[in-house]
Amino acid sequence: MRGLEAPGAVGPTGPSGAPGSQGPDGDVGGMGPEGPKGDDGPVGPKGPQGAAIF
């Protein structure tokens, strides 16, 4: 009866895997600062004339 043969050498390392998929988009940035104060309104109308003094 023939003796068992020694096992063969280990094969070469396989190829590297494919790169992973891209991660998700980041969150939306926060709200910007408050805008500047608006311009002052126009001057109001002229008041009524005072009573005549006699």
Curated annotation (Swiss-Prot):
It comes from the Viruses. InterPro entries: Collagen. Residues 26-35 have a biased composition (Gly residues). Residues 1-54 are annotated as: Disordered. It holds the Pfam family Collagen. Residues 42-54 have a biased composition (Low complexity). Residues 7-51 form the Collagen-like domain. This is Putative collagen-like domain-containing protein 065L. It comes from Frog virus 3 (isolate Goorha) (FV-3).
